[in-house]
Amino acid sequence: MSTSSRCLVRGSVNIDEFFHLPHIVRPGETISSTGLTKRAGGKGANQAFAVARAGGQVELDGAIGDDGIWVKEMLESAGVGTDKLKIVKDEVTGRAVIQSAADGENSIVLHAGANYYLPSPTPITSLATYTHLLVQNEVPLSSTLAYLTAAGQSSPPLTSVFNPSPMLTPAQLREFPWKHLSWLIVNEGELGDLLLAFGSSANPGEAKEDELQAKASAGILELHENDYFSKNVGIICTLGAKGILYYEPGKEVGYLPAAKLQNPVKDTTGAGDCFAGYFVAGLMRGKSLQDALKTCLVACGICVENEGAMESVPTLDAVKERLA
């Protein structure tokens, strides 16, 4: 890891509350839960946590309420810098209230809470001390765009990584400042959303299992050539248990299979955020793209063998041990 490499994550912090139920509550019904689990979450917090677990110097820029102090402490215990994590009075930390049924079905209610705290105008302190920026789409888009633009206009520009989850609207995608982006991380469904927004009829997210890799690969190349997109952006497309596709401008689309698991899958919730965090940390270390991605895949393999979003993210030592 370069001693001068530092990542800023601008993103969300949530408290995820899981109500364990015999079935999803029907309209007008009142039932008792069989258990309540409370976990730290939010894509910004999860990804910052993963960068730190992967050995990267990282700071989280976001907001919580007084009820989220324990999440702040959890992030700090992993090595995440929290000087830019604002505590908003008279506001709750972002919430995900999840009904988790015995048959595996779930129902989710989201409340943005402090994540949508946005001073006017958005204050962006100098990004000169950072080399990398990681953003998602769980805070106001205007803030995300401001940070990306500032990163792109810095001298030298920051390496910026965008994981558009939840997905932007078609109009927002067409107006997005792609020229300020270095890397885009999407899954096959999100890749299809982008192509449709840009006027293509291709949709890799609807491909049959045996056609997924070929159609997603073709979709990546089509996206790269689209006039709405920037030809300088690298693309990573995750395919779940099938592995990943990756594209560096000027090169061919590459493929890597998912890592072999040593234990049964317990929870895939945190896999995407684990991947994003480990990917940025790999870039910060100056590793080759293939080596960085192989490390990401092993980290995700360990992640899905455990429960929770943050709790399941492995340390770099654990990943190295499995790679050995």
Over which residues does each language-model region extend?
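Conserved beta-alpha-beta core of the PfkB/ribokinase-like small-molecule kinase fold
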Residues: 131-218, 242-243
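Conserved phosphate-binding/catalytic loop of the ribokinase/pfkB sugar-kinase fold
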Residues: 60, 84-88, 96-141
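Structural detector of well-ordered beta-strand residues that form the stable sheet scaffold
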Residues: 8, 59, 134, 159-161, ...
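Glycine/charged-rich beta-loop-alpha catalytic/anionic-binding loops adjacent to active sites
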Residues: 25-35, 73, 251-263
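Conserved phosphate-binding/catalytic region of the ribokinase-like
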Residues: 1-9, 169-171, 196-324
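Substrate-binding N-lobe of the ribokinase-like
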Residues: 6-7, 27-95, 102, 322-324
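Short beta-strand scaffold segments in enzyme catalytic cores
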Residues: 49, 95-99, 107-108, 243-247
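Positively charged, low-complexity intrinsically disordered leader regions
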Residues: 1-27
